[in-house]
Amino acid sequence: MENLRRNIAIVCGGDSSEHDVSLRSAQGLYSFFDKEKYNVYIVDVKGTDWHVNFSDGATAAIDKNDFSFKHNGKTVFFDYAYITIHGQPGENGVMQGYFDLIHLPYSPSGV
């Protein structure tokens, strides 16, 4: 049977001094999701380095053309993004504008 769970990105990190605080916020949010209903991934953004953090310490680079990544030989596309970045690019509209351009629904509010 095909996996029908939605792929959720918790986008964290950022370029401010609050990068590590944002990572902790993302971990907290991650803990609230029902993993039987959703595939939840933490996406760490710092400068031009955007990657998914896996629980085993491995990472996978985000393709910024469509906000996807490769895992186990398959391309994973996100259905929704939660922006938990403190400071830029999460609180200045940059991430929101990017998600608008690629037509990916996100939270919090728009640009």
Question: Could you say what each language-model-derived stretch is?
Answer:
Residues 1-111:
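ATP-binding N-terminal substructure of ATP-dependent carboxylate-amine bond-forming enzymes
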